[in-house]
């Protein structure tokens, strides 16, 4: 693991890629926009030239980043471009970062709906469609802070649906999104999985909608370096 401080957590940092989570302030104010500036230089990440924030819609929609994008309504972004930070806002939903050693990155907002609809598979399918000879052994999946099973109660129609379609990941009325995503990743041939192990509900350093009913969000980020 890279640097870990009171205002950010670095999961991978080398000469090719940076992956981190920033929780020093409410990043929800940057939603749904491409920012032509480095919003994370104060944390020591100096290489970033642009920061791309999705207009997250709780879907499994994934798009390929283009600097001319006008509509950022999606829950996943894919890019090969250097020094462009792909950003995921969350406060219990799972932020997923996918990195392929050939120089491809993706940032995914995998909440309950996105996980049920397997947004990770949608992302990998798009990547492999554009890059048919990729070695799947060189994919790396990072699961950043999100709600853990013991704090994720579901009920009503959602619980009934989960028990029917995802029974292995439901214990009484608790849903284990992290276990579901790991299972989906392994089915896609992704074996390099790093879970930061942080529950956003338990750790008060992180915003949690379930705990506090807040509209504030921390951000998970990935970018390729020159």
Swiss-Prot record:
Keyword set, alphabetical order: Copper, Hydrolase, Metal-binding, Oxidoreductase, Transferase, Zinc
Similarity field: Belongs to the purine nucleoside phosphorylase YfiH/LACC1 family.
Transmembrane annotation, as ranges: none
This protein's name: Purine nucleoside phosphorylase Cj1217c
Residues where Zn(2+) binds: 58, 93, 109
Function: Purine nucleoside enzyme that catalyzes the phosphorolysis of adenosine and inosine nucleosides, yielding D-ribose 1-phosphate and the respective free bases, adenine and hypoxanthine. Also catalyzes the phosphorolysis of S-methyl-5'-thioadenosine into adenine and S-methyl-5-thio-alpha-D-ribose 1-phosphate. Also has adenosine deaminase activity.
Catalysed reaction equations from the record: adenosine + phosphate = alpha-D-ribose 1-phosphate + adenine; S-methyl-5'-thioadenosine + phosphate = 5-(methylsulfanyl)-alpha-D-ribose 1-phosphate + adenine; inosine + phosphate = alpha-D-ribose 1-phosphate + hypoxanthine; adenosine + H2O + H(+) = inosine + NH4(+)
Gene3D superfamilies in UniProt: CNF1/YfiH-like putative cysteine hydrolases
Residues of the signal peptide: none
Listed Pfam families: Cu-oxidase_4 (PF02578)
Subunit structure, interactors included: Homodimer.
Requisite cofactors: Cu(2+); Zn(2+)
Disulfide bridge map: none
Database matches in InterPro entries: Cu_polyphenol_OxRdtase (IPR003730), Cu_polyphenol_OxRdtase_sf (IPR038371), Cytotoxic_necrot_fac-like_cat (IPR011324)
SUPFAM superfamilies the record matches: CNF1/YfiH-like putative cysteine hydrolases (SSF64438)
EC number(s) from the headed UniProt entry: 2.4.2.1, 3.5.4.4, 2.4.2.28
UniProt GO molecular function: adenosine deaminase activity; copper ion binding; oxidoreductase activity; S-methyl-5-thioadenosine phosphorylase activity
Entries under CDD domains matching the protein: YfiH
Xref: PANTHER family: PURINE NUCLEOSIDE PHOSPHORYLASE LACC1, UNCHARACTERIZED PROTEIN YFIH
């Amino acid at each position: 693991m890279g640097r870990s401080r009171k205002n950010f957590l670095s999961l991978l940092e080398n000469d090719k890629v940076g992956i981190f989570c920033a929780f020093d302030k409410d990043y929800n104010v940057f939603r749904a926009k491409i920012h032509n500036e480095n919003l994370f230089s104060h944390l020591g990440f100096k290489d970033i030239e642009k920061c791309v924030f999705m207009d997250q819609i709780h879907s499994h929609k994934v798009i390929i980043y283009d600097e001319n994008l006008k509509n950022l309504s999606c829950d996943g972004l894919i890019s090969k471009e250097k020094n462009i930070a792909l950003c995921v806002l969350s406060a219990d939903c799972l932020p997923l970062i996918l990195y392929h050693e050939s120089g491809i990155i993706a940032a995914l907002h995998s909440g309950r709906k996105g996980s049920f609809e397997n947004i990770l598979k949608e992302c990998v399918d798009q990547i492999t469609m554009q890059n048919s000879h990729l070695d799947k052994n060189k994919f790396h999946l990072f699961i950043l802070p999100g709600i853990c099973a013991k704090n994720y109660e579901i009920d009503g129609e959602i619980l009934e649906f989960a028990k029917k379609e995802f029974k292995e990941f439901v214990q009484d009325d608790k849903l284990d999104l992290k276990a579901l995503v790991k299972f989906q990743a392994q089915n896609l041939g992704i074996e390099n999985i790093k879970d930061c192990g942080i529950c956003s509900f338990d750790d008060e350093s992180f915003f949690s909608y379930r705990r506090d009913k807040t509209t504030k969000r921390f951000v998970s980020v990935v970018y390729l370096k020159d």
